[in-house]
A protein has these predicted regions:
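Arg/Lys-rich low-complexity patches in intrinsically disordered regions that function as generic
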Residues: 329, 347-355, 368
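Short linear regulatory motifs embedded in intrinsically disordered, acidic Ser/Thr-rich regions
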Residues: 354-363
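Short, flexible loop/turn elements at secondary-structure junctions
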Residues: 84-88, 114-116, 131-133, 167-170, ...
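Acidic, low-complexity intrinsically disordered tails
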Residues: 304-348
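Conserved RNase H-like, two-metal-ion catalytic cores of nucleic-acid enzymes
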Residues: 56-156, 179-181
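N-terminal accessory regions of nucleic-acid-interacting proteins
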Residues: 7-82
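Acidic, Mg2+-coordinating catalytic module of metal-dependent nucleases/exonucleases
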Residues: 1-11, 16-17, 25, 221-308
């Protein structure tokens, strides 16, 4: 219904107050040409142009627009696509029909998708906690590092890998969890100098707008790109619909697993959450590959790094015929945490590889 009537609060950064501002001007739908960022009350130089870009493409016949075509996504040898499923104080402890709030927050699932340059296959591993608590969170968090290190070592890509994610939330969550288990990360000292790349920031900074997407949520962008035939993967209509639903279902699974004395990864509902998580990871990969192929061929990464170091300019200052990279945070975790890890005694042996339960084994598709 909201899409049918052009509900204004569907639009990026448009809340009730912004809708009221539009209604006061006789504007009842975002499809109205008079509906602009200014009409909604947005006049700042950062958000207003993005809102107008979204509204413009959604009132046009174009499928995708780039605010700047001179962008380059890192072409690392190993491209990781990481997605955390978390449970927070909204649904951590379910004792009755209604969730009981707590102050705890845990990662209960980590999806690791990756592709290797020159190899067509899509790879995915899912790490799922046996139950939702700090002990199991730590186990899968450390296992994530074991698995990723094994992958980069196998492909000789210690200095040539990028970790893609969607929005700052993933990186912030990683940083906070790393702080929580700092002592245990000492075994990885010197091995974790990964580049993190925020795809949502790429879309908002450029901006890249897609007809059918009114926000920059992964589901909005990926679903719109799927409808246009830009990507081939989408979430199942009868599956886990969103992250909130995944949290609620995971909380129920954790309680059931404790009662039965089994891992919640064995429960059918968790298998659906794993499928949902893989789609999150895979659509990021397909988005990266579509944009990379849709834009001009990129120069080598060495050439790009020289350009970036030489110019030392912000994106708006880069001339139109010069390639550039969207700035990304290149430390694996917050600098102060990184320093703390590197000061810990370095293990004399490589970190151990944690064996995955049968329900969490790796999937690979060579057809993609």
């Amino acid at each position: 219904i909201a899409m049918k009537i052009g509900e204004i609060t569907q639009v990026y950064y448009a809340g009730i107050n912004h809708r009221n501002a539009a209604l006061a001007k006789g504007i009842t739908s975002w499809r109205d040409d008079r509906c602009t960022a200014a009409a909604l009350g947005h006049n700042g130089p950062k958000i207003a142009p993005i809102i107008d870009a979204i509204l413009d493409i959604n009132r046009s016949t174009d499928k995708i627009r780039y605010g700047d075509r001179n962008i380059k996504i890192p072409d690392a040898k190993v491209r990781f696509y990481i997605d955390f499923e978390t449970i927070n104080d909204i649904v951590e402890d379910i004792k009755s029909d209604r969730p009981i709030t707590t102050t705890q927050s845990y990662i209960f699932m980590i999806g690791i998708g990756w592709k290797v340059r020159g190899k067509p296959g899509w790879n995915y591993r899912c790490l799922t906690a046996d139950t939702i608590d700090s002990t199991n969170e730590k186990e899968i968090f450390l296992s994530m590092h074991d698995n990723m290190l094994e992958i980069v070592e196998t492909n000789d890509a210690f200095e040539d890998c990028t970790v893609f994610h969607w929005s700052h939330a993933e990186k912030t969550l990683y940083d906070h969890t790393a702080e929580k288990y700092l002592d245990d990360l000492g075994q990885y000292s010197g091995y974790l100098n990964w580049e993190w790349y925020d795809l949502c920031k790429l879309f908002t900074s450029t901006p890249i707008t897609v007809r059918g997407a009114l926000t920059f949520s992964l589901k909005d962008i990926a679903s719109a790109m799927y409808r246009h035939g830009f990507i081939q993967t989408n979430w199942a209509a009868d599956g886990i619909l969103d992250g909130l639903n995944a949290m609620i279902k995971a909380a129920e699974c954790s309680e059931n697993a404790k009662k039965k004395g089994i891992s919640m990864a064995e429960l059918p509902v968790m298998k659906r959450i794993i499928e949902y998580n893989e789609v999150d990871c895979k659509v990021m990969m397909e988005i990266v590959e579509f944009i990379s192929n849709d834009l001009h061929p990129a120069p080598s990464s060495k050439y790009m790094s020289k350009i970036t170091r030489k110019n030392k300019r912000t994106i708006p200052e880069v001339i139109a015929n010069e390639w550039h990279e969207i700035p990304t945070k290149k430390t694996k975790i917050m600098p102060e945490v990184l320093d703390d890890i590197n000061e810990l005694p370095k293990s004399t042996t490589r970190p151990r590889k944690r064996k995955l339960p049968d329900a969490q084994e790796e999937t690979q598709n060579d057809d993609d």
